[in-house]
């Protein structure tokens, strides 16, 4: 069974050729399948879906978005990546962070015997912050365009040839695209 994904019509552009005539060309959108609807997969899908030259589809094994676990702290580079993905507002709404005047402190070292201050690692502009995994996933899912998330799609195999890659799901459907990207966890079918 084939998963029918509706794709937008290709963009058209005009090109001037040598004899001053105008030729219409169609630009093919790169088709991307993302397997895994956790924080990484959803964040990447949100970021890629902002590019009009990409047709992004997200496949999640669960019947809905859900995340387990507790709090997670993001280091300075992770917070900068969140900013570059355009998810900073979603992150800041739910993140706990250090209050002034310690907002740039990432980590502080103290002596165990008397709690005397030793040193600190600074991360100007990002500091130390943390979120609950489920809250962060809920916040970034709100940025995901309608119609690109598909649930109940547990990937069991990926095959590729010179022109495309195909993800096969345990419900008998499959998705063929230009690229398949795996965010499907430790038992990744994409990685195999």
Segments predicted by a language model, with ranges:
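Active-site-adjacent segment of FAD-dependent monooxygenases/related oxidoreductases
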Residues: 68-143
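Generic structural signal for small/hydrophobic residues in well-ordered secondary structure
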Residues: 43-45, 60, 82, 140, ...
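Beta1/beta-strand and adjacent pyrophosphate-binding region of the FAD-binding site
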Residues: 23-40
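Conserved Rossmann-like nucleotide-cofactor binding loop
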Residues: 40, 64, 187
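Glycine-rich FAD pyrophosphate-binding loop
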Residues: 49-70
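Short hydrophobic core segments
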Residues: 35, 155, 175-186
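A conserved short coil-to-beta-strand element within the FAD-binding core of flavoproteins
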Residues: 151-165
């Amino acid at each position: 069974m084939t998963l029918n994904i509706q794709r937008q019509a290709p963009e058209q552009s005009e090109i001037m050729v040598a004899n001053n005539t105008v030729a219409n060309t169609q630009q093919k959108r790169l088709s991307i399948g993302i397997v895994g609807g956790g924080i990484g997969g959803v964040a990447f899908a949100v970021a890629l879906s902002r590019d009009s030259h990409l047709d992004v589809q997200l496949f999640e094994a669960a019947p809905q978005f859900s995340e387990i676990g507790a709090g997670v702290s993001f280091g300075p580079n992770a917070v900068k990546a969140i900013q570059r993905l355009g998810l900073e507002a979603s992150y800041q709404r739910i993140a706990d962070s250090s209050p002034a005047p310690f907002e740039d402190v990432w980590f502080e070292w103290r002596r165990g015997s008397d709690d005397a201050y030793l040193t600190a690692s600074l991360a100007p502009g990002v500091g130390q912050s943390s979120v609950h995994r489920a809250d962060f996933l809920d916040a970034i899912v709100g940025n995901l365009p309608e119609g690109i998330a598909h649930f109940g799609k547990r990937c069991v195999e990926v095959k590729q040839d010179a022109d495309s890659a195909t993800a096969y799901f345990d419900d008998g459907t499959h998705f063929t695209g230009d690229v398949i990207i795996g965010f499907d966890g430790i038992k990744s079918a994409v990685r195999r």
